[in-house]
């Protein structure tokens, strides 16, 4: 055994050993499935990856040592726009670019010592994977959950192509051509996630081991609203204008209606003299993003259509407007304007001089007209015809009941959640396995013809239709149903489809006959521990839950939720240098520090140094492999686990990285001194042995408990404390010391696997430390013979003394009164009461 810790000698040797050893299943043991959200193969790991993957690696190694049959797989979320952009910019095929990146990142993961079941590795861009993605899509089709309808896309009028949202800048221009982007309708594919809205909402209550924050975010995204759908008649439109409202008790206060600019009624009902203004406004709104339109920080804009509808409750005419803040995809695409009792409506009505009516009086009767602000609370109905005097909740019920009787509306539950648009006008994605036949209509590709493979000979220009839409030879096929000439679907699927079921494929990754066997998923699923960023709290996690429920209903799964426990790790931050005036960021090598202030070189521009999320654009990223090359993989892993609790932000610190490297060196020294006999074997007493053994078993108790509770930082702190206790211990060969050496190596192994394996071998042990048993806790070793007792007199601390741990209350009182510091406050006074907090303090109440 070398005298000094040298990770550069240890780590390659251990990694080679692990790579050559088969990944053995441990049948007959309870299962544990640990999973980190699989990465997009960008080609380079960042510290956020290292933090995420270190967490599940610790958990999986720990669980294996605790006797579990562990599944800890990895794969690649490999479809997506960056590969297609690389094809355009660099002339390299997306498949080649992706494969190169996967190979590079696979090597990086191995160099960091992560214990993955590499034999289960998947890549979503592989036909062997997306064959089954297509098969599952067809399950949705058979269930009536996949359909086509017109949807709005971003259209680049110069390049004549559809753009993803991320390809449109803040000014609404194309990232490539610079043209102002237009909104255009296009037939696209959707999945009916709204059919599962209520179950997705209610089942959040069963996810007790998910962060509350994530559950609330999903609840808000689903956005359940209970209210009514009411119909306002309008000439020439048999169905009238349908609106949804959560406040039917305010219907007598409606002074206008607002349609979304995209609403199909707009063109039909607009008065001739208003058409030019309305069309101009619609065109203007189409260039705005949804986020801009609903932003609370910008003024609401609208224009009158010149049309008039009828409020059936009052018999009064109400003008019909269109406004940017109403979205066609939400509700009915129309809202009723009640400015007296809605803040947004109040602002809009004030801006356009529309009437404002009071129809809900405050309980104290304090409101008078004209209203100076919207009253949005519940109250008592006024100016509401036969419903006057009812409180708001009762008024809601009675008005909905009356509307149903009159045929003017009905009670309704609405969700903010919209059906999932999965069509992408892209090449590098999973082809949608559908064919369009002039005789049969939309026809699914039969199972035996799957996968519908992506053609390899494709031209990428970034202009015109999707590359697939240009390949007539690929598009033209025979109809699977009647044999007539037909055409393939040229859209590919949203990449969230791929990641909505990958955790199921890992259970049976080499199955060539089906996406997964029922036996495999029944054994491994649900995932016991899932780890990933909070940015996936809504879409990925919600879509995965949706997929699980649909596949359950199709008879493919037997469980309701995919992930039992969820941990969302915090971001990794590092110092970034920015010019506050221009918001320009500077690389560290262009920054100099003078007197605690920072300046740009060479012009001396004053800069601000702040901790920000690591990013290439901010020049503050830390390459994990740079840290590994200097300090080793174990140090990098230990740092990201120790620096902060996993759910909190982690601030990078070079000094703390060095601190973890030094700690590993000290543990190495502890084991070396034991193995070599360099530490003197001085005689020790039984009490000293008991004290050290207590420290050893405290560490066993704390490290195991802390891993279970994600407290990796305090677990590592407990290891540091134990190593310090052993370094200070006089005997280097006593039974307690020997036990401590073996224990600290085992406890360290899940966190720092390379040094753990090396030290295990140095101790003369055969086999892999990570398949050995976790140290057994001896509860009796934790019992203390003496404790430090705080003594209070009338609630104020007067002394602390060592007392036998098993002393009775009477004995504690005697010992307390024997203290000279205590007697100064009790002599000559009567003891009225004695309060004992076992193991902590005694309080003497005197008077």
From Swiss-Prot:
- Short motif ('KMSKS' region): ranges: 613-617
Location, primary (coarse class): cytoplasm
Q: Where in the cell is it found?
A: Cytoplasm
Q: Name one GO cellular component term.
A: cytosol
**Position of motif 'HIGH' region?**
39-49
Cross-referenced Pfam families: Anticodon_1, tRNA-synt_1, tRNA-synt_1_2, tRNA-synt_1g
Which residues does the annotation say bind ATP? 616
Q: Which residues cross the membrane?
A: none
Report the EC number(s), separated by commas if there are several: 6.1.1.4
Q: Which Gene Ontology BP terms does the record give?
A: leucyl-tRNA aminoacylation
The reaction(s) this protein catalyses: tRNA(Leu) + L-leucine + ATP = L-leucyl-tRNA(Leu) + AMP + diphosphate
What family is this protein classified in? Answer: Belongs to the class-I aminoacyl-tRNA synthetase family.
HAMAP family tied to this protein: Leu_tRNA_synth_B (MF_00049_B)
This one is known as: Leucine--tRNA ligase
Q: Which organism is it from?
A: Gloeobacter violaceus (strain ATCC 29082 / PCC 7421)
| Gene assigned in the entry | leuS
